[in-house]
Amino acid sequence: QLVTNFKSFTKQYGGFLSEFTHGEYRYLANAVEQFFINGGTRCFISRVCPPDAVVAKAKKGSLSVEAANPGKWGNRVQISLSTVTRKKMQLIAKSGEAFIAKSVDGFKEGDTVEFEGEYNRIASIYDRTVSFEGKFKNNPVDESVIAKKVVYLVTVDVSVRYNDEVENYSELSFNMSSPYYIGAKLATSELVKVDVTPDKNMGNPVEAILGKG
């Protein structure tokens, strides 16, 4: 495996080892660090894993996460998720069981939305006609020029941290048809591998993973 700096090495193979646990086999990290300090630019590392080497992993709700590589370093990876409701859609009229939106820009079929604390999912979008999987308890229609009632797109901000290295992903979706699908976006992570199980429940996706509170 090619590494081009010491941070890349520690991310993939871990940091310095203690004499107590590794004895005379503890010097690889020191050697690689000195290699780059002294002007080295390309270092090839071959990992020899013991039979019992494991990958740090965790599963909560619909989200399964594991470290990108085996080793204890993965135990220090931290992931945080937060619900985001920035994009909004104004529904200006009702049409049968569907609604007419002022604009559907940024919204797709399968997206989770929120209106007055109630979660729903977009079933279909045709032109500006939008239908939802569930019924709203309160009427979401607002014909005003400046709307007071709007439907919000529910997305998730994700932060992946390992020591000083941080990967931030903004406004991700659990909708597989979205260009911001969490599974596709986190596939580019150099710290973790993620698997997402489709969730048919309509609710806050972060609460479905982490619980309320």
Regions found by a protein language model. Name each.
Residues 1-213:
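Surface-exposed assembly/interface segments
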